[in-house]
Curated annotation (Swiss-Prot):
Aquaporins contain two tandem repeats each containing three membrane-spanning domains and a pore-forming loop with the signature motif Asn-Pro-Ala (NPA). A motif (NPA 1) lies at residues 111-113. CDD domains: MIP. This is Aquaporin PIP2-6. The chain crosses the membrane at residues 42-62, 81-101, 130-150, 172-192, 206-226, 254-274. The gene is PIP2-6.
Amino acid sequence: MGKEVDVSTLEAGGVRDRDYADPPPAPLIDIDELGKWSLYRAVIAEFVATLLFLYITVATVIGYKHQTDASASGPDAACSGVGILGIAWAFGGMIFILVYCTAGISGGHINPAVTFGLFLARKVSLVRALLYMAAQSLGAICGVALVKGFQSGFYARYGGGANEVSAGYSTGTGLAAEIIGTFVLVYTVFSATDPKRNARDSHVPVLAPLPIGFAVFMVHLATIPITGTGINPARSLGAAVVYNNSKAWSDQWIFWVGPFIGAAIAALYHQIVLRASARGYGSFRSNA
């Protein structure tokens, strides 16, 4: 049975009687933002959130490696520690907590790839995106530096939480893992923050941070054995800067190119395929 969409309704700006409204696209360059305290408050929130994220997660990784080190913890060390599951929970849980805390201030990006995807979708201006990325990168460096400062011996011994392509995996495999993992994350961000979903679920404020944190958890389970899981260029940069190892630096490009490609694909998929305006395509017919 055929079903027609009313073209006049579409041309008027969307379906009538909607209980939500799409926000207008952010300007590409908004110089006026530089004079607003709300921008700098958001930048500070991104810095602090990324610092806390890196401190907790890298400390968890270092602690796990120490607990499973037979030379330090005895012959049964392999059976102790939080395991990969615990590491994945640390990353996913911290993202859930920090997105919940900062969503109303900065949007809770905590990741340059997320910021890049939202910029491509015109959710944030170029000025805000660049300041967020700088704050996230600096926060990540400071967070890892705190771990090194408090656990200097363990930090150097157990790799500093740096991302590298693991032995047995090719560069292409590592890059693909980062692209797909970041796509999952950024796609989840777009879906969880969709205006239509927010209008329906606004009475349950945890429903946006929860799937985002869970996406981070699931991606870590899949990609920790391959790359240690980047999907966040700031996280990878912070560990590389403080650890300062040649292998971490030689693989660093993977943890920027991969996440940015994954974020771009997710943004295009959400904006062009899932949220495409009917105005751009004329009338539609469904023969379902």
